[in-house]
């Protein structure tokens, strides 16, 4: 009887992490563009949100990592790293509705439902135009290798002249944080 209990315990210890991993994969890991049907409306809504924040100084890196989003925990180290690099390169650093150390000044904003996929990073140029909005990077921790974000924060003067919407990535995302 003792042997059967030990085997059942061992089986439970093996199956539980597999089940948790499957649940996480189904609930949080996926293609960001599947969650946002209209990239143009998504980008326009973010631009409208930025325009409504008159106190923001540009160029800026803006983080949105809602506290209710499990992916926030995985993305946070990369977001802090991006903030430090961007600040060194002349960007102002902000976070919307957050309170994380290392992510810049906190701004409380009312976000539209269309902005429901997170984590999200925005990069604005000197005139306040959003030049990048989307994922930090691809991968489960939003931090796999160099990304567009890394190249964009290297120099505020070298941002693209058009808006880039970074949704074509498989990453950890929360749909309704």
Regions found by a protein language model. Give the residues of each.
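Thiol-/selenol-based redox modules, centered on thioredoxin-like
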Residues: 137-177
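Ser/Thr/Pro/Gly-rich low-complexity linker/stalk segments immediately outside membranes or between
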Residues: 26-41
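A short, hydrophobic beta-strand/beta-hairpin element that forms part of a small beta-sheet core
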Residues: 118-138
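Hydrophobic membrane-insertion alpha-helices, especially the h-region
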Residues: 2-27
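Short active-site neighborhood of thiol/selenol oxidoreductases, capturing the structured segment around
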Residues: 51-72, 79, 153
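Structural cue for short, hydrophobic secondary-structure segments
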Residues: 62-65, 95, 123
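Short, basic/aromatic recognition patches
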Residues: 103-114
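Conserved helix-turn-beta segment immediately C-terminal to the redox Cys motif
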Residues: 39-50, 59, 75-97
């Amino acid at each position: 009887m003792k042997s059967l209990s030990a085997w059942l315990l061992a089986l439970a210890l093996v199956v539980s992490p597999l089940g948790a991993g499957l649940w996480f994969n189904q609930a949080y890991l996926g293609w960001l563009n599947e969650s946002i049907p209209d990239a143009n409306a998504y980008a326009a809504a973010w631009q409208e949100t930025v325009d409504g924040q008159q106190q923001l100084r540009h160029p800026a890196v803006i983080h949105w990592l809602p506290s209710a989003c499990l992916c926030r925990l995985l993305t946070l180290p990369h977001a802090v790293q991006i903030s430090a690099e961007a600040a060194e390169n002349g960007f102002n650093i902000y976070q919307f509705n957050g309170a994380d150390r290392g992510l810049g000044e906190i701004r409380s904003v009312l976000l539209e439902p269309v902005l429901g996929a997170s984590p999200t990073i925005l990069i604005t140029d000197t005139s306040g135009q959003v030049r990048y909005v989307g994922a930090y990077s691809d991968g489960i921790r939003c931090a796999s290798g160099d990304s567009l974000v890394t190249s964009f924060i290297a120099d505020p003067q070298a941002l693209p002249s058009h808006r880039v919407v970074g949704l074509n990535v498989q990453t950890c995302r929360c749909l309704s944080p």
